[in-house]
């Protein structure tokens, strides 16, 4: 072939080939797929696209990809109607045809620990994110409430009672870990674990007296709720009056003493406290609280196995003196994590002189009712409905662990339907961004948070909107649940704040995505020691690390976000490719597949598509079937195209070198003529077969220049062409154009400076005054990730 656009050479042969390719491109543009869209088939049992005689069982992939693409533009796939079709494609099935969960009566509830991060993290890791997390707020505009009896979904009709029993155990385990509130009444809930600062003002001293009256005290105001009997005077003159203040302990269900918040600062106020002991004796004590007194210390580490009673006073006559007790709601000292050690009792300094045997007998006598250990009562700034907003069911923890159960919480009413909410967006790296931020040639360590969502506390009023039940008790999420669309955004804020501080404090490259941390440093030994320091730093703040999923030592090859990452490249595991090729081989030509089955297939193809030589336009026929919810039929050429994509596996370089080549070819078009100009001075003018929209004529000339000259970049004065978004064009032409122009750069040049503007109007080209710019949008990368 003669050199293109050289005036000194005979370009008749070159022009003939260019004219031929231009007519082929025009035919693709003029052939419209609309006639083929949604054409119903004659009968479901008939293969309307039966394979020809001698059709090979496996796709022929020897031809180059460009030839396969051209063949797919001739032998087109088809869209069908909405009649029933095949629901299985290899091992894939429609979303409603997923393998049903099998109930396991031996399911074990996994160990769930108390995840309570220290609010000191706000000072240790300065960030504006904490104002959205301490506490997090969830305010739906409207809510649909369901009865308590509908709390557990009827996922297993043959094992309803067993299913509800295991769900009840699971919810109780979450309650014991401080993740749930348990409903007591319309205005009262109880929880376990260490209270947060914003919960202190709502804590209640809740205790029961023998006449059936339940007394709640919040912020110094007492409130009596009568059960049955009228009020009685139960203070006996011969009972001694002592102060028995306990911090963080509860003796009986609804029979507890709790120090509450004192909004009055240093004011003293007197109340009469009544203690209920199941032996029938009660003690009335006159107290004066002062927030200036010493604070009680609580070790809230383990659970108490032995039953605890309040330390009651002896039968000696009271002196009538008022004993000052500390108000501890604003100054509770606790250990880093956990609960009180078994057997310990926390009493005031004045009651330490009492005989322990006599003190314990009074409350341990006839202590048959169930006791709540280490619980707090809270009366939030909201009402606690005796209804639920989400439903529950259990599944296997994962495909490899079927002995443990996983709790699935369905709060889908907040993401779809009339109660749907618009959740905030947040920066999430795509593959292109990940390639540009990962450092090259550094050892890496990955960390994984344990129970990541359960680190995020909710405002008590927001918790009342997230109600679940096992059919007996109503629980509210005190920490963020996984079934709400707001939770990933909150987790992103949480890990981003931690990652920024880790990078600043330890001077290493840190990247966070959801509950995953990636640490990089040039020195492997230094990175190893730093990773231990990072784990200690996080654990001191009450943030739990899942060491089972954490890299024990620095490695060069790591699996992160589903990708296999080595020192210089990113790739996908070979097993994923083999599974996808197997699925494509099992496609039956001409058979009709249900659109939900195609939806799952497209999801798998999208994950591997960046690692192939294909583009998203190749999947548009399947997207059309999914959008219109109709059946889809593969053609032989289209199946070959998909198989060819999975054969052309490539690995992507980390930190690819960006080059800005100098433009040497320019194109321009009018409704009737198109021109290609070369920097050497040669040019060629072509006449279109018909008048079309100008953006299509411009794209035709750019594609022709790519086919005939194969430049590294092309100048064009069409923004439509430079942006490379061709969704509005017929599919086969859009696919070919995207395939041709993806590898090269397109620069925008104003029409007055376009060198090809003259030849398209039968004037000489002008390359003297050239002004151009790329229109591709720069990839957003956070500032802290740009430096390395």
UniProtKB/Swiss-Prot annotation:
Residue sites binding Mg(2+) per the record: 448, 515-516
Site entry: Priming of reverse-transcription by covalently linking the first nucleotide of the (-)DNA: 96
Polymerase/reverse transcriptase domain (RT), as annotated region: 366-655
Region feature RnaseH domain (RH), mapped onto this chain: 656-788
EC number: 2.7.7.7, 2.7.7.49, 3.1.26.4
Entry annotated with the keyword Nuclease: yes
UniProt name for this protein: Protein P
Natural source organism: Duck hepatitis B virus (isolate brown Shanghai duck S5)
Gene: P
């Amino acid at each position: 072939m003669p050199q293109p656009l050289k005036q000194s050479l005979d370009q008749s042969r070159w022009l003939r080939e260019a004219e031929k390719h231009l007519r082929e491109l025009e035919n693709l543009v003029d052939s419209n797929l609309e006639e083929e869209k949604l054409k119903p088939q004659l009968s479901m049992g008939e293969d309307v696209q039966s394979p020809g005689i001698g059709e090979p069982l496996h796709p022929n992939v020897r031809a180059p990809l460009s030839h396969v693409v051209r063949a797919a533009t001739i032998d087109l796939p088809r869209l069908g109607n909405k009649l029933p079709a095949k629901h299985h494609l290899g091992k894939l099935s429609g979303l409603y045809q997923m393998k049903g969960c099998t109930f396991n009566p031996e399911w074990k509830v996994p160990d769930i620990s108390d995840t309570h991060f220290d609010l000191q993290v706000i000072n240790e890791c300065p960030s504006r994110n904490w104002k959205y997390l301490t506490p997090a707020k969830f305010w739906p505009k409207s809510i649909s409430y369901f009865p308590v009896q509908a709390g557990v979904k009827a996922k297993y009709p043959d094992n309803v009672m067993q299913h509800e029993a295991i769900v009840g155990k699971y919810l109780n385990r979450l309650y014991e870990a401080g993740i749930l509130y348990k409903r007591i009444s319309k205005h009262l809930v109880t929880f376990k674990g260490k209270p947060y600062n914003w919960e202190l003002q709502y804590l209640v001293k809740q205790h029961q007296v023998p006449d059936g009256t339940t007394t709640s005290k919040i912020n110094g105001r007492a409130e009596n709720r009568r059960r049955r009997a009228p009020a009685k005077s139960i203070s006996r003159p011969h009972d001694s009056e002592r102060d028995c203040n306990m911090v963080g302990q509860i003796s009986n269900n609804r029979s507890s003493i709790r120090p509450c918040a004192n909004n009055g600062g240093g004011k003293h106020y007197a109340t009469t406290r009544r203690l209920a002991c199941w032996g029938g004796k009660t003690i009335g004590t006159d107290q004066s609280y002062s927030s200036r007194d010493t604070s009680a210390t609580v070790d809230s580490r383990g659970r108490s196995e032995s039953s605890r009673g309040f330390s009651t006073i002896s039968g000696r006559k009271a002196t009538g003196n008022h004993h000052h007790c500390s108000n501890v709601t604003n100054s509770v000292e606790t250990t880093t994590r956990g609960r009180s050690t078994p057997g310990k009792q926390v009493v005031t300094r004045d009651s330490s002189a009492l005989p322990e045997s006599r003190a314990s007998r009074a409350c341990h006598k006839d202590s048959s009712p169930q006791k709540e250990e280490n619980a707090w009562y809270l009366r939030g700034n909201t009402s606690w409905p005796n209804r639920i907003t989400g439903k529950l069911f259990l599944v296997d923890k994962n495909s490899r662990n079927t002995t443990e159960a996983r709790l699935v919480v369905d709060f889908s009413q907040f993401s779809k339907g009339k109660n749907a909410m618009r959740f905030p967006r947040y920066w999430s790296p795509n593959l292109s961004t990940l390639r540009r931020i990962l450092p090259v040639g550094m050892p890496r360590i990955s960390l994984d948070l344990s129970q990541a969502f359960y680190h995020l506390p909710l405002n008590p009023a927001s918790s009342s909107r997230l109600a679940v039940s096992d059919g007996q008790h109503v629980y509210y999420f005190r920490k963020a649940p996984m079934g709400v669309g707001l939770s990933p955004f909150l987790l992103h804020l949480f890990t981003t704040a931690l990652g920024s501080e880790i990078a600043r404090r330890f001077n290493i490259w840190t990247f966070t995505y959801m509950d995953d941390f990636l640490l990089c440093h040039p020195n492997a030994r230094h990175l190893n020691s730093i990773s231990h320091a990072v784990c200690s730093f996080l654990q001191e703040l009450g943030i739990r690390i899942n060491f089972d999923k954490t890299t024990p030592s620095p490695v060069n090859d790591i699996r992160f976000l589903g990708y296999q990452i080595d020192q210089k490249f990113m790739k996908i595991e070979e097993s994923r490719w083999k599974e996808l090729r197997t699925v494509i081989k099992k496609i039956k030509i001409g058979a009709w597949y249900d659109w939900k089955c195609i939806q799952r297939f497209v999801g798998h193809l999208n994950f591997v598509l960046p690692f192939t030589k294909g583009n998203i336009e190749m999947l548009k026929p399947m997207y059309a079937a999914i959008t219109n919810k109709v059946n889809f039929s593969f053609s032989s050429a289209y199946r070959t195209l998909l198989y060819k994509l999975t054969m052309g596996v490539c690995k992507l370089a980390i930190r690819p070198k960006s080059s800005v080549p100098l433009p040497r070819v320019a194109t321009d078009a009018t409704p009737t003529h198109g021109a290609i100009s070369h920097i050497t001075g040669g040019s060629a003018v072509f006449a279109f077969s018909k008048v079309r929209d100008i953006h299509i004529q411009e794209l035709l000339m750019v594609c022709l220049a790519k086919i005939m000259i194969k430049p590294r970049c092309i100048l064009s004065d069409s923004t439509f062409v430079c942006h490379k978004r061709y969704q509005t064009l017929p599919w086969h032409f859009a696919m070919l154009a995207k395939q041709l122009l993806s590898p090269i750069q397109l620069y925008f040049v104003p029409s007055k400076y376009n060198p090809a503007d003259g030849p398209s109007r039968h004037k000489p080209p002008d390359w003297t005054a050239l002004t151009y710019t790329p229109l591709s949008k720069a990839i957003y990368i956070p500032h802290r990730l740009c430096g390395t």
